[in-house]
Amino acid sequence: MNNKKIFELIFWVLMSVLMFILITGFALTATLFMLIAPVPFMLITRRLGPKMTAIGVLIGVSCIYLLSDPFTSIIYIITFCALGVAFGTISLRAKNGFDYMLFSIAASVFSKIILITVFSQLTGSNPFMIDPEVTNKMISTAANIFSKAGISAPSLSLKDYAKILTDRLSLLMPSMLILFAAMDSLLSYCLASHIVKRLKYEPIVKMPPFGEWRCPQNIFLALLVSLAVDLASRAFPDKRQLVVISANLLEVLRAIFIIQGLSLAWYFMTLRKVHRFFKSTFVIFGIIFSPISYILYIVGIFDICYDLRKLIRRKLK
């Protein structure tokens, strides 16, 4: 065990501990650091091997235990250590970018299910069930802000909206879990790839450029299944399981089609030599602005059906 490896191990473990402290202590940075939480142990696993990784996990968990409590240490083990080791192992064994993303998302979802199970057992509450009181407080705060600006809303409509929002969020929690897993898998990959390139480590398996991303046409089988389940849920409205499966499957497919539409838009803008800043800005607006995301949703479906890139290339010839 040489000094360079010891220094790398200590550096990445301390970086992981610092990120965890920032997540627990600063709400504004929590989401960002949560999405890239696995990166330090992902790099340790790739760079230093299983023995050094085990030592790193022991050091990291000991630091968190000394700074907080056993429950917080469990969260750190699952979200930072275990998931980082999983991402690192997958990145070493994956043959291509698609395999990496598929298995990383599965590992991320599995880790979050374990975390939710542990949380439920220790606290006795279900994280999938959102407390209506919390939603009411959020909406009341928003209503107070609007009232100060001269915009008022009846309290009854706010309560109704709070109930609808609570029910909707509880219903779509599984799909939100999957989409969050996809986000942390992708962002961890991007950050780790950048670090590996800068430090000249062993390169991570490459993913195709965003403009070349294409879903296989058999994705429509999942769409047909979701529509069939949706019809069944309407025929048997008392079966909540059908409603949950249908709503979440449709939400995940909607996200996939929007990403497909964004990929096509990125491809077209690349051909037109649009600056990367403007392409990235369009992607952000396409995700958060509903009218644009709906158009991208339709475009994504057509692109999977007809491969619109071929049509674009033919017209440009």
Name each region found by the language model.
Residues 117-169:
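Membrane-interface interhelical loops and short interface/amphipathic helices
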Residues 151-204:
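Selected alpha-helical membrane-embedding segments in polytopic membrane proteins
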Residues 6-14, 54-58, 74, 78, ...:
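Hydrophobic alpha-helical transmembrane segments
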Residues 12, 76-121:
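Short helix-perturbing small/polar motifs within transmembrane alpha-helices
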Residues 1-59, 273, 277-280:
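Hydrophobic transmembrane alpha-helices
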Residues 239-317:
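Long, positively charged, glycine-interspersed low-complexity recognition regions
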Residues 30-89, 303:
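Alpha-helical membrane segments and adjacent membrane-interface helices in multi-pass membrane proteins
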Residues 199-256, 260:
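Small-residue-rich helix-loop
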